[in-house]
Amino acid sequence: MEKNMIGKISQVMGPVVDVDFDGYLPIINEAIEVNINLEGTQTRLVLEVAAHLGDGRVRTIAMDMSEGLVRGMNATATGSPIKVPVGEKVLGRIFNVIGETIDDGEQVTDAPMWSIHRQPPALVEQSTTTEMFETGIKVVDLLAPYSKGGKVGLFGGAGVGKTVIIMELIHNVAMGHDGLSVFAGVGERTREGNDLYHEMKDSNVLDKVALCYGQMSEPPGARNRIALTGLTMAEYFRDEKGLDVLMFVDNIFRFAQSGSEMSALLGRIPSAVGYQPTLAREMGALQDRITSTKNGSITSVQAVYVPADDLTDPAPASVFAHLDATTVLNRKIAEKGIYPAVDPLDSSSRLLDPQILGEEHYNVARGVQQTLQKYKDLQDIIAILGMDELSEDDKNIVERARKIEKFLSQPFFVAEVFTGSPGKYVSLADTIKGFKMILSGECDHMPEGSFYMVGGIDEAIEKAQKMK
């Protein structure tokens, strides 16, 4: 190690640390390591260069708590950005922002190491074809389909099933596509991260997923950069292995929030609502790397927390510009016992177009939405006057809409433990066939209950015969 790559800490302000170098100037985003002896244990603290202050002094952001740092301590420049392990060895493991495993297992030492700061694929490398990504979940595939290499926003409050949908998607991608997933917990509750790990272990999907956690309790640097750590692992599988990878970010709002904290600590002038002036650029730099190339794709599902339910807040607004589809979870649907509690009228997708999906899929999806909307409009009349006052046509619409509502429910593989009914993966062709039959009136003779918590329409027909 060159002597002049060793600097001295000159100032510590919480997570912001200034380091003086003589003769060597670390570049922006370069990692600097400090060895701290805290209460008899040696720990490695990584700092990331955020600004040059002049005269060989750099301002850095700490990737962990800065307790134990003192002025005059040695800090060693590494000559490169933070590097994390990638490849097969990361599957089934939990990592922190600097690529160390935090799951009590052995550290990953013999895997390729990639920098977390990377350029997005060149324009000529990117794939321009729009292709649907089949999830095996009826309501998603029919009404708000995901695109390969696209970005999906998962909106929902606490306890409506965001995590269960994420786990089911990981399971179905592993089963239906032989694909891999990467989960980045950005500013997550530590308890939720722990629950997710154990639930994945119990559902046998852990060996197909890499987990990266930067919890709420960590400094803003770790919460911000953890999204890049997870994305780098996903990029390896896309670029080197040619796979279709699913990338989960929970929660993308915390990425913007931690960026705003870092910006304030670095002394930048805040922008609207106190956010960092570079919010759109930071969000764009992350989202730009999530894309399809001619080799493989990264499809991302991002949980979006909306502060105070204000969709015009700059953080969620900066995410919307990048999304191809939105899956909205609704508490009222969950209260009816219909899971997944996806709102069929609020969820949307830019793929819902006859030129992309074909006429049949498009017409069935629109027919389902029209029937459900008409039922919603008739509910006030039903509440006041009862069903008897409706015309025959309206009665048919109400009955079909109730069957559609029930048929949008589906038993999940990862929820078998709670529901006791085996999970179902429903192919797109079966999904379209089932809803087409309900809309055309072929299922008018079947009882409503036969559509609840089944896979395809054939299963509902079998159930109806048993109920007679």
Curated annotation (Swiss-Prot):
HAMAP family: ATP_synth_beta_bact. This is ATP synthase subunit beta. Pfam families: ATP-synt_ab, ATP-synt_ab_N, ATP-synt_VA_C. One of its GO terms (molecular function) is ATP hydrolysis activity. InterPro entries: AAA+_ATPase, ATP-synt_VA_C, ATP_synth_F1_bsu, ATPase_a/bsu_AS, ATPase_alpha/beta_chains, ATPase_F1/V1/A1_a/bsu_N, ATPase_F1/V1/A1_a/bsu_N_sf, ATPase_F1/V1/A1_a/bsu_nucl-bd. The keyword Cell membrane applies. GO terms for cellular component: plasma membrane; proton-transporting ATP synthase complex. It comes from the Bacteria. It catalyses: ATP + H2O + 4 H(+)(in) = ADP + phosphate + 5 H(+)(out). It is found in: Cell inner membrane. It is an enzyme of class 7 (translocase). Produces ATP from ADP in the presence of a proton gradient across the membrane. The catalytic sites are hosted primarily by the beta subunits. The keyword Cell membrane applies. It is a peripheral membrane protein. ATP binds at G156, G157, A158, G159, V160, G161, K162, T163. F-type ATPases have 2 components, CF(1) - the catalytic core - and CF(0) - the membrane proton channel. CF(1) has five subunits: alpha(3), beta(3), gamma(1), delta(1), epsilon(1). CF(0) has three main subunits: a(1), b(2) and c(9-12). The alpha and beta chains form an alternating ring which encloses part of the gamma chain. CF(1) is attached to CF(0) by a central stalk formed by the gamma and epsilon chains, while a peripheral stalk is formed by the delta and b chains.
